[in-house]
């Protein structure tokens, strides 16, 4: 499945949960997450990948930085991952 299909699905599902999913791009830093997702009471950095896709080294550094700083971070590969992630984060 194409990454843009999963990304579009994420945006729709987050909106249905009362949140927003901002496209995140940084000209100064490569490897940042694809989306910053704001749900009621929480903010997540979300990286989207195609099935079998892997994080680049820069994406791994970004993930570790965010986790070290106590931020929420998720990598999602499929629509099912999006649904499962939303189930666990919106309980």
Please annotate each region the language model reported.
Residues 1-91:
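Catalytic phosphate/metal-binding cores of nucleic-acid and nucleotide-processing enzymes, i.e., regions
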């Amino acid at each position: 499945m194409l990454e843009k299909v999963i990304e579009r699905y994420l945006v729709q599902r987050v909106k249905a949960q009362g949140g927003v999913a901002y496209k995140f791009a940084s000209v100064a830093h490569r490897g940042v997450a694809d989306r910053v997702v704001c749900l009621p009471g929480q903010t997540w950095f979300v990286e989207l990948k195609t099935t079998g896709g892997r994080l680049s080294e820069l994406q791994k550094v970004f993930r570790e930085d965010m986790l070290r700083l106590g931020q929420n971070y998720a990598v999602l590969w499929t629509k099912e991952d999006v649904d499962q992630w939303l189930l666990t984060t919106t309980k």
